[in-house]
Amino acid sequence: MASNNVAQFAAELKMPAGVLLEQLQAAGVQKASEDDALSETDKARLLDHLRRSHGSNDADKRKITLTKRHTSEIKQSDATGKARTIQVEVRKKRTFVRRDEAAEQAAEATGNGQEAAEDLELQRREEEARHEAELLEKQAQELKARQEQLAREEAERQAREQAAEAERRRAEEEAAKKRAAAVAEAAAAAREQAEQERASQDEERAAAERAAQREAAKKAEDAAREQAEKARLEQEEIAKRRAKAEAEARAIREMMNTPRKAQVKAPEPPPKPAEAPKPAEAKGTLHKPARPAGETSARPAAKKPAPAAAAQPAATTQPAGPGGDKKKAGGKGGWQDDAAKRRGIKTRGDTSGGVDRGWRGGPKGRGKHQESTTFQAPTEPIVREVHVPETITVADLAHKMSVKASEVIKVMMKLGQMVTINQMLDQETAMIVVEELGHHAVAAKLDDPEAMLVEGEASDAPQLPRPPVVTVMGHVDHGKTSLLDYIRRAKVAAGEAGGITQHIGAYHVETPRGVITFLDTPGHEAFTAMRARGAKATDIVILVVAADDGVMPQTKEAISHAKAGGVPLVVAINKIDKPEANPERVKQELVAEGVVPEEYGGDSPFVPVSAKTGAGIDDLLENVLLQAEVLELKAPVEAPAKGLVIEAKLDKGKGPVATILVQSGTLNRGDVVLAGSAYGRVRAMLDETGKPTKAAGPSIPVEIQGLSEVPAAGEEVIVMPDDRKAREVALFRQGKFRDVKLAKQQAAKLENMLEQMGEGEVQYLPLIVKADVQGSQEALVQSLLKLSNDEVRVQIVHSAVGGISESDVNLATASKAVIIGFNTRADAQARKLAESNGIDIRYYNIIYDAVDEVKAAMSGMLAPEKREVVTGMVEVRQVFKVPKVGAVAGCMVTDGVVKRTSSVRVLRNNVVIHTGELDSLKRFKDDVKEVRQGFECGMSVKNFNDIMEGDQFEVFEVTEVARTL
């Protein structure tokens, strides 16, 4: 339709006619009313004006676009609880357009018109607002009036009811008064009539009650009968479905057990009209679908299974969602059937006409006999008893509850924690999740890990011969390391601090007669535990005894370790090249210790050797290999590795490093190992020369990296099948170790408290010990604890492997401890912090230097010993009584010297009657500091006046003497 006037054009543009008139006036087209005609020229002028006003008609106009960027940072915690900094950038964009002068003039020209139009628009809007306000006020008044009217009506109704109630009560009272008067006038007749009426009323009421009871009983009986009928129908329906499912499962088993060629197509049953199943009403929240067909149910089984169910081929039962049976009720397969067929098991040789072939359907017309399967939701929520171990993943927890992992993740999100499907949950959190989902959580203790490890020990791998593990033991400085150096052609002893071995060294040597693995143990008395570990891991012990020194304490200890472990001994009498060597004396001393040489009828070969010249080394190796042949050492090679931690340390760059002796099996790089409470994957494996190796067989020492923490020396190393089992056993052991440690600390606190109560104040020397390897740290701590006595005790605040860090200095500041670094150093930050806090850090590389200095420090903490030294004897010649002073003795110094600061004992007939201090010492009338032998003096004793002639004063001084441990 052509728009000839303003109103029609406004309707075409879908805008108010008044706004269009304002725009036409602004464009210079003078139109006064909506009925004014519009020409094409007027429309063109309006379009040109609108284009100019919006800046789209001038090609020469220039635009300036300004973009402001503002960057800020926010901190947000991720799922693991770590704070992450996120960069946030805010961009603001503004565009400025420079208009031409003609547009500005036109804008100025039309400014007055626009202002007028704006005034009109403002007035119109004010009028509309005023009108709306009036309407609102009117509505509020009407509402208020209606509420008042309702209130008045309610008050009137209540008043009427109250009046009616009062009138009724008044009438009742009057009637009662009249009845009372009537009863008073004719008591006998009224009483009889009242009794008859009451009896009739009671009979009527009793009859009504009996009728009501009969009606209620009838209704209850009908309801119970209906409920029982419904329950019976449900039980029959469930029994039919269970029988049908069992028949289908039996058919599946028979089909799977029958050879493919022998399978014959089952006869097709006549088509039956499908019945729409009754949808069961689910009560509560269900977290698992219905029971599988083969699962034993607590409900009674069906008495009459469907006869045709066994002959039918099995159909894949798929749980349907809510309302999933709508399409199946009519007997025709819907989208649920298609999805079931696509998800079905594709079985080759199936004769079911394509029911279970997925998208590979059979020939046409064969799929008509398939039956629609329905999901019957359980009528009660299934509450499961979930056993929760100490750690469990989200996926495993969901599997235990038979729910989807997303449900567990949702519950964790409600609890305020973001988790993934593979994230580990602790036992407490997992139990909360189980309770949130409506199940019963039970804290399940892990099975005994040792039992699990024992079960895994059985291996069918063949036993193959393995090299012997030989431990070299003996007293300190008897030449053990030098002997090994000659065998290995190395120079280890020259580089050891103080010339003594303080670590266990593990080496394997390839000799012409075979491979031998040597363990070099320390001989110092502090390393008892190290030597015990060496004897535990060994097959043969070489006992090194110096020919010029004989049997020493650590030699006896090594003999006892070897006997306790049942390990054969090979005695090497070293240093036979020295002039003062006496091998025969050594033999006699060893016989006294129970080590009898073969030449005396014993079983221990004695080999004289010299680590300096190499004499007798070949004979020693030959005897060792001979003993190994007698022992017939064998171990499986193609099996998971088992071994022993010989030594462990914390490297600053590599992390925890452990020296392991493989005892059986093969340790490969990448295996998951468990060592005590430490576990991890072997990231790198080095031999004793520092070269990387990929595998280590039995009796081969290697150094591995990748453990979670520094293991304790002497722990057993086992290769685990996966990270999860290793982590579970390690956490189990950590918990046990923590409980034992806390119990020991509690017992120690109680013991210390009782001892302090009984013996008074005890001095403590707090120490923090940091060592390079686990064995040295253990030996140093044990040696320092042995220095404790009843008055001064060593308190090990903290001991660990690794360098001295800031946390150690902070701990020393809090506990006022001294830090001892054994073959370790403090980093720059720790040194600065120690200097600022005045913490003493001592460095040692020889163990007995550390022990001696701590012993000296403890000696300084001992209370000094007080000793009395008699300096003189005085004889009382005369006694003077001085007022306000007391008794003053005139004395003669018969021996020694008397000092003013000395103490005295008063002797009478050589019996001590008083011990005290001098109050004054005078010679003539002058106070003096001392009086020597042969001079007279006047003396008074503090707080003692019972002085008689002939008494003697024994003068003595108390001196303090420093004590030593």
Swiss-Prot record:
- Ranges for the region named G2 are 499-503
* Location of region: G4: 574-577
Using the UniProt annotation, give all residue ranges assigned to the region (G5): 610-612
Query: For GTP, which residues are the binding ones?
Result: 474-481, 520-524, 574-577
Molecular-function GO terms, alphabetical: GTP binding; GTPase activity; guanosine tetraphosphate binding; translation initiation factor activity
Q: Which GO terms describe its cellular component?
A: cytosol
What keywords is this UniProt entry annotated with? Cytoplasm, GTP-binding, Initiation factor, Nucleotide-binding, Protein biosynthesis
Q: Outline the extent of the tr-type G domain.
A: 465-634
Report whether Nucleotide-binding shows up as a keyword of the record.
yes
Top-rank taxon? Bacteria
Where is this protein primarily located?
cytoplasm
Compositional bias (Pro residues) at which positions? 267-276
Where is the segment annotated Disordered? 94-375
Matching entries from InterPro entries are given as: DNA-bd_dom_put_sf, EF-G-like_DII, EFTu-like_2, IF2_assoc_dom_bac, IF2_II, IF2_N, P-loop_NTPase, Small_GTP-bd
Q: Where is the composition biased (Gly residues)?
A: 351-364
Task: List every stretch annotated G3.
Answer: 520-523
Q: Where in the cell is it found?
A: Cytoplasm
Compositional bias segments (type: Low complexity): 104-115, 181-191, 303-320
Q: Where is this region: G1?
A: 474-481
| Compositional bias annotation for Basic and acidic residues | 121-177, 192-253
- What PANTHER family would the database entry show? TR-TYPE G DOMAIN-CONTAINING PROTEIN, TRANSLATION INITIATION FACTOR IF-2-RELATED
Chain's role: One of the essential components for the initiation of protein synthesis. Protects formylmethionyl-tRNA from spontaneous hydrolysis and promotes its binding to the 30S ribosomal subunits. Also involved in the hydrolysis of GTP during the formation of the 70S ribosomal complex.
Question: Can you tell me which family this protein belongs to?
Answer: Belongs to the TRAFAC class translation factor GTPase superfamily. Classic translation factor GTPase family. IF-2 subfamily.
According to UniProt, the name of this protein is: Translation initiation factor IF-2
Per the UniProt record, the lineage of the source organism begins with: Bacteria, Pseudomonadati, Pseudomonadota, Betaproteobacteria, Burkholderiales
Identify the coding gene: infB
